[in-house]
């Protein structure tokens, strides 16, 4: 249980294992702080340009002073001073940081944490978005629709055993059995990503998962309880798509992104999700293990695509780490959030489109700022060197140049994403 969690249906007794700076929220905040301490690539490039600009300006100023000494010695100092004042390395230095600060401010108000320095820059360039299903496009609230037993246990006992097996699991399926937990002990529990969970219950090694794992049968999309070779019960599960998933996917398609769905669930469950959402997926695949998801993302990257991965679970951690930019949704596991470049703090999939929109606007404003800073200096420096600008005019122009860059960046804080 993470700090700040709210029990849904009953009181709980907890043992505190971490407090203060050791909590998951503090760990996420440290990730954000580290991201902000490391300057993005574009900011570092702007800093290098500004440093070379200062060196070049110094050389030009000295040359201008010497030239004016031989032409009109009485104005040499005034012209050199105006040249130094009107030049604006500040505009170059502010072009990127001002835009990034405004972008991060906007994203924080939307409940979006950016945990990697270059994530915004990468997010602006993505053309493909890959989604997990359970807990991402669905609400993660699974329900048991039907139970079939095979003579060894009753329906009630099968549900209680399943609840014991799932007690310590963070998988969304676990919530479907919590109401049937009668307190029986499950020991030596182990989870196999993409297959299921195993533990010793009532002195017997039992498994809960796909048919091949739990009961040595052909996979039919249901959840099976067994000992690895024979079946005790079969559960038909159902879930509800998130109400904001359809509009969010439509918004991403409107932004020009190609969408893919990779899920560890059955073919029927994936097909039902796609049909329910009327989702414009270019492809969808079921029974995907973590390594299968990662391989698919690698394949898309090898085709030249910039891939964003959206997920929430332990199974998604490897592919989140392997994507060009990764997004962990609110309520996901700690490992998924620690593996992600962007973390959604609110249960709103529309935030993904808002983040991409902000990233693209940020890139556009950075380019505008850099173009303005360069253009301003290309015009202002020759005028100052020619003696056409007095120092007070140079000071005013320099201030206005820096102010223009800052005000342009602040437009990011005012925009409203569609």
Name the predicted role of every residue range:
Residues 6, 78, 88-165, 319, ...:
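Conserved catalytic phosphorylation-site environment of P-type ATPases
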Residues 51-87, 111, 276, 371-397:
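Helix-interface capping motifs at the ends of transmembrane segments in multi-pass membrane proteins
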Residues 144-257, 267, 279-297:
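P-type ATPase nucleotide-binding
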Residues 345-418:
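Membrane-embedded transport module
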Residues 1-81, 242, 358-365:
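Actuator/coupling domain of P-type ATPases
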Residues 18, 38, 203, 227-368, ...:
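Conserved ATP-binding TGD loop and adjacent catalytic N/P-domain core of P-type ATPases
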Residues 49, 53, 80-91, 310, ...:
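Hydrophobic transmembrane alpha-helices
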